[in-house]
Amino acid sequence: MKGKFSIVLHTHLPFCLGKGRWPFGEEWLFETVFDTYLPLLKVLNELVEEGKRFKIVVGLTPVLLEQLKSYYFKEKFLEYLDQKEELGKKDLVHFKGNPTYTKLTEYYLREIEDIRNLFVSLNEDIVSGFISLERKGFVELITSAATHAYLPLLKNDLSREVEVKSGVIIHKNWTGTSPSGFWLPECGYKPGVEEILKENGIKYFILDAHSLVEGREVIMEYGRRLPKLKIPDESKTFLPYEIKDDLYVFLRNPSTSEQVWSRDFGYPGDGVYREFHKKFEVSGFQYWKITDKNVPLGEKEIYNVDEAREKAKVHAHHFVSLLKEKLSSFYRESGVEGIILSAYDTELFGHWWYEGPLWLKEVLSLISEDKDIDSVSPSDFIKTGVRRKGLFRESSWGLGGFHYTWYNSETSWMWDMIHEDEDEFKSLFHELSGKEGSLLLKEFLLELSSDWPFLVTTSQAKDYGKERFLEHRRKFLNIVEFLKGIKRETVDLDKIETEDFIFKDLMIEDLRR
């Protein structure tokens, strides 16, 4: 054995059920479940059935867990599948007489049926599918901040503590286990966060490689685009760092992450893979391949499933050989077995990169048969006792490695409001109780979601991001007024609770224990 490999999949979507349908809203979740979560469960279960030995880490954010477990999601997702199937049947009529397109439509219709059957076989409970794999030893589930708040920019430690502790509580409520690992939203780190993680029983978290402090530290300016932080010598990512007693930092390996993440330089940009951006006007089905990244959408060639599958296997072999080469080199130089940790947004696999789940299955299968490398979780590697010491800078995995993606000229007004509301929440925290206090907590957490400034900055759904932020802030302030005896007759707590139906079992009293 020359080393270990750990793949970490960060799985998150903001609270979107009942908050619009298309193009912005709950269809985000339905699409990602169809494209990614269920295909991922499918390939992992296939590996188990084939007798492969493997381990991966799946992070499920608490806000996503709550949505996947809701009756609303289960009902609406089945409706989504029915609608998708009906649109596919219309494609069959449209493409009648064109066997190339008809064959692909039939393939997609079978895929819909397979996904429906898998969902039903899980009793419409995707979370239980991951829990089952964890209990069998193939998956390690980790948690995150309750609503994926961007922790470094929060004003008060109490806000960070509430996000972290709520996340751990919700994870325990749904999985029955205490999480060992914690995904800092956007890998956003600020010195001192580790104290909060340790207080909540966390054993490890993950940062981008450039977070490691080397030499003189540079003071960053908030709100400006800055040159990308320098990535250290890659060998410094091959062992974890003990940041506090029994709390470890694992660094994302830069080159293996880029090899998979990048559409321009990585595997997903290969011309034979399915083109994400071109969709048929009737169904939204994707019938074309990338062909070449410089080819206009109107000139894309027809997608070939078999060709793409073969290329995914080729890329899996290349990736495993890359892992072995890097781990062997580190072993020769250091005399110890290292670990390569590669972390990605889960939706890359299937949603953005259609062939991603197949590639992942092939990678884990190849590693299972290889004597020089083993797939493990960070928890497994910690038990080896091999570690380093290190310091880490305020950072993220966002643009430039700092905070610009969430804090800039377009979003600074959001943070002014957030900081005001943090102070309000802090002033009330020790007096809050019962339904009203727990409802205030919920709206506070939803206001803190990092997704709202992200959507504004990236222009993916700028107006939607602003509206959602202001919606939850308005509800937070209304509940504050209710608690203070102001306008009590105009604040409908039941309506707020119905509209924002997650976190029903999260009690404000639990956070003070």
Task: Give the role of each language-model region.
Residues G59-L64, A145, G181-K190, H210, ...:
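Short, solvent-exposed turn/loop segments enriched in Gly/Ser/Thr/Pro and often Arg
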Residues N45-R53, E124-I142, K198, F330-S334:
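Acidic (Asp/Glu)-rich catalytic clusters
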Residues Y150, K203-G215, D374-S377:
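His/Asp/Glu-enriched short active-site or ligand-binding loop at hydrolase and phosphoryl-transfer sites
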Residues P179-Y189, D345-F349, A461:
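Conserved short loop/turn motifs at secondary-structure junctions
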Residues F95-S180:
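Well-ordered mid-protein domain cores that form the structural environment of catalytic cofactors
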Residues G188, V193-I202:
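Hydrophobic, small-residue-rich alpha-helical packing segments that form membrane-like cores
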Residues R160-L184, L322-A343:
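CE4/NodB-like, metal-dependent polysaccharide N-deacetylase domain
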